[in-house]
Amino acid sequence: QEGDGYISFPTIFLSLKRLVPVAEEAKIITDDTLLTQEELNEFKQLHNKILIAQTPISSATTITSKNKQSIGVSTELYDWNQNSMGQDNLGKIILALFSFKRLHDKYPRQYKGGILAIDEMDATMYPASQVELLKVLRKYASKLNLQILFTTHSMSLLKAMDDLVQEVSKQEE
């Protein structure tokens, strides 16, 4: 009701269920048409930047199962069935960012921001990729007015967060 004091924000929570291996899912539906061409290009760029990968991505396939929706990548060397858990995890996180971007673009007057919560963000990702992901999340948080919350046990990620706080503190002086 109007005046009840609650502010409504789109919210996405990425639980550890996102880490269930695709091979263990009973039923998988694939779709190559979920992303626009612009999103596909952005996904490829983000994927390789965050994972510090050089191999060109030939296609990106949306994978939907009972537990999750993610994006699998295929290259000239392997297809989406052989993606690492880190790639699968990253695909899910990027899809969440794209969901907020779609809301931002489709409802520019109504969209006020959103909340993205990620349980164990660092899971399945090596330290350098965790830091790259943090940089990308910071950029999207600013661009899309997102509050991003995550849990971690990664010392690399905690150090990167501390460095980021120090950098912001210096800018405010």
Model-derived segments and spans:
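Glycine-rich phosphate-binding loops of NTPases
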Residues: Q1-F9
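Extended helical coiled-coil dimerization/tether regions that scaffold
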Residues: I12, L16-Y111
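Glutamate identity and glutamate-enriched acidic tracts
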Residues: E2, E25, E38-E42, E76, ...
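Switch/communication elements of ASCE P-loop NTPase nucleotide-binding domains
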Residues: N81-E173
